[in-house]
A protein has these predicted regions:
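Short catalytic/ligand-binding loop motif for oxyanion handling, primarily in non-cytosolic enzymes
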Residues: 14-15, 59-60, 93-96, 166-170, ...
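Structural motif
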Residues: 49-55, 175-179
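Conserved acidic residues
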Residues: 45-50, 190
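A glycine-rich, often tryptophan-bearing local segment used as a flexible ligand/cofactor-contacting loop or short
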Residues: 57-58, 62-130
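Hydrophobic/aromatic beta-strand patches that form the interior of the parallel beta-sheet core
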Residues: 32, 85, 100, 159, ...
Length: 196
């Protein structure tokens, strides 16, 4: 069974997101939770994949607990065959301002796109189309979208798109990132009764 090292640091990483990922991944993977007090080199040496959940972590909080050596360690891990999984906040952290594990693409706020149907950063539901053609409603809380940056993009597979057709979930090499919350549990929706 492969090992996923799931980062957790409350409140930047939502406990609900972390627990949702553990619930979703545990039947298929060995999930080990790690935090800023752990030795990252050791964590990565024992893992097949490093994962980052959703939460409220912005650039300020990221730089409070991740130094350049941490970013380099994550990037080297991915370059040497390790996998990266990022959901919502973890999707943003794959981008050029953070771990920089994407090639020729970046992550920006979906709600800032001119044709986005969601315009505010609150809990709601996004209608997403999966790569196999069907659509589903998925929990959304200020998730990202994939856009080109100034470098030539390397190929990536679009696994799901937002209602406006922009990529919501992709796989590029060893990196898988998701803007919405497929790990969401039913009680999340109880916190936002207006989306029922």
């Amino acid at each position: 069974m492969k090992t996923i090292a799931l980062f957790s640091h409350h409140p930047e990483c939502s406990n609900e997101c972390t627990l949702g990922m553990i619930t979703a991944l545990s039947p298929h993977y060995r999930v080990r939770v790690w935090g800023i007090a752990d030795n990252l080199d050791y964590v990565l040496s024992q893992s097949d994949c490093v994962a980052f959940p959703g939460g409220i972590g912005d650039s300020d909080s990221y730089y409070e607990f991740f130094k350049r050596r941490h970013g380099n360690a994550i990037a080297n891990f991915v370059d040497n065959g390790g996998k990266y999984l990022g959901i919502c906040m973890g999707q943003y952290w794959a981008g050029s301002h953070y771990f920089d594990v994407l090639k020729g693409i970046d992550v920006v706020q979906y709600i800032k796109q001119p044709d986005a149907e969601i315009k505010r950063s609150y809990g709601t539901v996004a209608k997403v189309t999966m790569d196999y053609g069907s659509w589903k409603n998925m929990f959304f809380y200020d998730g990202g979208v994939i856009v080109p940056n100034n470098d030539p993009p390397e190929p990536y597979k679009v696994k799901a798109t937002y209602q406006n057709g922009m990529p919501m979930a992709i796989i590029q090499g060893n990196v898988g990132i998701i803007g919405c919350h497929p790990e969401s549990e039913m009680f999340w929706y109880d916190l936002y009764p207006y989306i029922r």
